[in-house]
Amino acid sequence: MGVFCWSGCLVISLQLLLGAALDNLSTCKEEDYHYEYTECDSTGSRWRVAVPNPGKACAGLPDPVKGKECTFSCAAGEFLEISSQLCSKCEPGTYSLGTGIKFDEWDKMPQGFSNVATYMENTAEFSDNKPDSCVNSSWIPRGNYIESNSDDCTVSLIYAVHLKKAGSVSFEYQYLDNNIFFEFFIQNDQCQEMSSSSDKWVKLSDNSDWMNHMVSLKSGTNILYWRTTGILMGTKVAKPVLIKNITIEGVAYTSECFPCKPGTYSDEAGSSSCKICPRNTYSDRQAKECIKCFEEKEYSEEGASKCEERPPCTKKDLFQIHTPCDSERKTQVIYKWIEPKICREELPASIKLPASGNKEDCPPCNPGYFSNGTSACSPCPVGTYSNGLSECKTCPAGTEPVLGFEYKWWNILPGNMKTSCFNVGNSKCDGMNGWEVAGDHIQSGIGGTDNDYLILNLHISGFKPPTSVTGATGAELGRVTFVFENICVSDCVLYFMVDINRKSTSLVESFAGRKVYQSYTHVIHKNATYMFTWAFQRTNLAQDSRRFVNDIAKIYSIMVTNAIDGVSSSCRACALGPQQLGSSCVPCPAGHYIDKESNMCKECPPNTYLTPHQVYGKEACVPCGPGSKSNKDHSACYSECLVTYTNENQTLSYNFNNLGKVATLLNGPSFTSKGTKYYHLFNMSLCGHGGEKMAVCTDNITDVTGKDIEADSDDYSNVVKTFVCQSTIIPSDSKGFRTALSSQSVNLADSFLGVTNNSSLRGITISPDIFPSHLKIPDVNFFFKSLATTSSCEQGRATVISMRCNPAKLGQGDISVPRNCPAATCDGCNFYFLWETAEACPLCMESDYQKIEGACKHGQQETHYVWNEMKLCTNGVSLPEKNVSACESIDFWLKVGAGVGAFTAVLLIALTCYFWKKNQKLEYKYSKLVITANSKECELPAPDSCAIMEGEDNEDDVIYSNKQSLLEKLKSLATKEKEHNFESVQLKSSRAQNI
């Protein structure tokens, strides 16, 4: 009971204290609060409530009242005044879109916009430094527009808006470089995309124009994403995406009008937009009118927020031009101030406009034109020609005019050319000439700022080859050749671009920095309407001051061959029909040249090809290189996959037919400076297929992005079909695409030069150090050439595929690149590949195996054949089967011979020992006899008597021997004393016994 009493007392006390506090607050005034709408309920209704301003405390706020329905909105030029809940017109100096908001000021990032830089690589490499590598990537405000990143990070510009009803978002953009992927998509508050993913890819801009993109929005929360992802290899820098004038429609109401930004004004109430202040005026924010500058000393550009002081005139403020030829065919150099003129001549440091030069003779007409007695040159009529110095003449019989354009004299701009100036950030140079004629050349103009694009266009309706080569296949249709130079101290660039059938402009080549006098040729293979564009930019950095006005590009001559609407500067021999009716020309069949004597078509000799731009004379048929033959049309040479050559007095034959299919090498991975993983994909067609180029590389950007871009299937800008080509592959897990990205396809080899075991052919050399080898068999080198030239490869690209025998690698084997050049090239112009496979071994011959004969067993002998210890051959002759032949065994006779030999040896040894012992005894007896005889040499010898004396016994037996012993015979032979024959006497004396 006590607890309840205490609680009740506490409540009563609080009420008393609150009432006392409210009594002490002042009554709310209109300036102390503002009105807001509550959130809409399920019925689409809401309430208007009064909310105290920050820092204000008052009592007596107005009671809530029912507000306008949630879908209510005011018209353009009006805003909803919540206090009265009525639409009111915007005051002068402000504007309103009614149901929309607009962002056209980009001096800083507008409120509500945010930047998010991410790295969409999903693999593990470089995971530690990826977040930091993109921390400096963002969208950058540039005043009138906002600029995307130009690296290979993924950066999103995000803005969230809540719509009470369905609306739309639109923006202007400039998107020129397909090396950046540009997406615009919308998510709801659950981070779910609200439209088809195939619609999120933004189309490339046409010819540097600002394009408009609009997408419908649903009611509710819409999170808008402008996302760019760079696909950059090496040191390449992409052109960023530019966005301006973002407009969002569908906002339920606008509670206030937007002020006009500096440089604009609105002079009427209820304006839906602001007007730009004209030149030499300025305005502040929320201006009702523009204020004029003091024009004698000040100036301003369109849309200026202040006036600038006019500087003294310098050489940067004037330019010179050549006047058109007058009726006397005279011209002169005159000087003019750059318009609009912003400098002051009366200042002490100012220069004066130089006087005009003396009149000079006009340069002659360009080839194909003639002077008609007026100040202009006229084109020669059809069927006639002129060198520009003489009247037009009719081509002789048996000849036809050479059509084209050759511009080398620049007194006036030709009729099929135009010039303009363009800047993405301002309109200072709009209406200016981007290029100026200068007699023997045409040069870039002054422009408004240093980052202007100075544009020169040449329109060609189509291309048609001469009549004599109309039947040729695979021949070029025409060429565009221009001679130029860049005179720069800055980072200037001259771009050469091509637009086919007025679809989109693609960059062909760029020439950065200072370039000396040089020539560039672009070959045309497809008949279409072309717009060739030269665009010169002094620097890509926007600057208020002019620092590089003296940087210029000069084009001395432009030559276009085989143009349909061209003129003729000469005539060429053409082929005549068999009946030679009149002088009508007939087309030669494919692979035929025009004989100089008869002007008839004759087929090129075997294994020669016809030059694409010269068919007159037998010398137009060029012999094919070693190991190659011409195709049926004599338009190119190719290898039949059969190669034969002599090495160290040995003829080696190869058969590469099993390698004739298109081979693929995926080399990598490599990584950009930001860590993007990419691969180099090479497709190569080695030989065969009748000379048809089978290697195809395709840019699948359209497949990846789903862009609806019209493109012919044979458009060379999307598909490269040749002998060897290269593409840059970014795996699907690298940037979050649904499939791997293939881009930057390059033609590396469109002409086959020959195959040889030598290390060089027609100026292309492969060093032995590139692919070291210890084999006795040298590599077989296939030499290719790409005729397309670039600024870095003035002679075109060259490719060498070295075929190396490796019996351990069966089938297709392995293809590798030089160890020191992982991209197959070290200079970007010469590419080298090593193809190791057993199929690259020479065909086997009889010298590649040896014969081994077995022992004779049971009257039979087997002969086996085995490959040499290191088999370096394939296919060819087969290893012979085992051979069995009859034989006679020699085991028995060998045993008999051994027995007889052993017996004979023992017998000889025994006889030798016997006779030697007997000879020793005889020598002993003889020596004793000699000693006895010497002791009695003073005594008379006893008379020899054959009779037996009295008293003596017949005991002595005398034996006479005239034969030599075996040992003595051997001695006599050794001493060659055959005349001394000793008599052996054996005595038996009783006297000796008595002694």
Curated annotation (Swiss-Prot):
Membrane topology category: Single-pass type I membrane protein
Induction: Expression is down-regulated by ras.
Stretches of the chain found on the membrane's Extracellular side: 22-895
Subcellular location(s) of the protein: Cell membrane
Main localization, broad class: membrane
Residue positions with a glycan: N24, N136, N245, N372, N527, N649, N683, N700, N758, N883
Annotated InterPro entries: Elapor1-like_3rd, Elapor1/2, Elapor1/2_C, Elapor1/2_GBD, Elapor1/2_MRH, Elapor1/2_TNFR-like, Growth_fac_rcpt_cys_sf, Man6P_isomerase_rcpt-bd_dom_sf
Ranges of the Cytoplasmic topological domain: 917-995
Signal sequence coordinates: 1-21
Annotated MRH domain residues: 639-843
Tissue distribution: Expressed in the animal half of the embryo during gastrulation, becoming restricted to the ventral ectoderm at stage 12.5. At the neurula stage, expressed in the anterior ectoderm surrounding the neural plate, and weakly in the epidermis. Expression is especially high in the presumptive hatching gland and cement gland regions. Surprisingly, by the tailbud stage (stage 22), expression is limited to the hatching gland and is not seen in the cement gland. Conversely, in tadpoles expressed broadly in the head, heart and fin.
Disulfide bonds, paired cysteine numbers: C641-C687, C697-C725, C793-C829, C805-C841
GO cellular-component term (any): membrane
GO biological process: negative regulation of nervous system development; positive regulation of BMP signaling pathway; positive regulation of epidermis development
Entry's transmembrane regions: 896-916
Main function: Functions as a regulator of the BMP signaling pathway and is involved in epidermal differentiation.
Name by which UniProt lists this protein: Endosome/lysosome-associated apoptosis and autophagy regulator family member 2
Gene source species: Xenopus laevis
Lineage: Eukaryota, Metazoa, Chordata, Craniata, Vertebrata
Gene field: elapor2
